[in-house]
Amino acid sequence: MALLEICCYSMECALTAQQNGADRVELCAAPKEGGLTPSLGVLKSVRQRVTIPVHPIIRPRGGDFCYSDGEFAAILEDVRTVRELGFPGLVTGVLEVDGNVDMPRMEKIMAAAGPLAVTFHRAFDMCANPLNTLNNLAELGITRVLTSGQKSDALQGLSKIMELIAHRDAPIIMAGAGVRAENLHHFLDAGVLEVHSSAGAWQASPMRYRNQGLSMSSDAHADEYSRYVVDGAAVAEMKGIIECHQAK
């Protein structure tokens, strides 16, 4: 049966995902940045309360995946922290300036991760040659690759995802970006064994007083009175679709 991973941005969202049938959680911070490394407090809280597998993302900033020496040092420290806290896996990825996998740095990450299952995240979708990259990741011992098939969403990239799945000796290919209940059957019919979804929505802040003329970010139009949360009903619906597909 296909595995359902839910992207979560808080302990509460991780618990919601767990309660509604998620098989695994990718734990992140900063949804508007596409997911950054969670704080130590969040990591500890989730480790204590969530019982399904949780894989934190290790990504020090938004933007590209070519990192300075200081950023890479932080990545290695975060990898060690996640391992010491007892998480079963993590999610990360590093590229060189030419769009190839930074093999020396990824080798250091793999050494620091030890027995943890490492997912190479959507840095894969920014690589120059996906098939060569897949070979490199297999050589590194990467467990899985999260990808939209190098398109803006996974449904558009489904043909590339199928090509990657068919590649001999490849890591597990997990489809992600825009995967929802309404299009999930396309991925299941194509033989995708793992799917990744945020299964969520922006929720209004409970604050009654609002200073509408102020933004906490450089985007003057950013809505400071909403937050991204996992929709338990959406998770349950996706899990039900997967179970029905398996029963066919």
Curated annotation (Swiss-Prot):
Entry-linked SUPFAM superfamilies: CutC-like
HAMAP family reported for this sequence: CutC
Pfam families: CutC
InterPro entries: CutC-like (IPR005627), CutC-like_dom_sf (IPR036822)
Protein's cellular compartments: Cytoplasm
Family the entry assigns: Belongs to the CutC family.
Protein name per its UniProtKB record: PF03932 family protein CutC
Organism the protein comes from: Escherichia coli O81 (strain ED1a)
Gene Ontology molecular-function annotations: copper ion binding
Top-level taxon of origin: Bacteria
Record-level GO cellular component terms: cytoplasm
Key words of the record: Cytoplasm
Oligomer and partners: Homodimer.
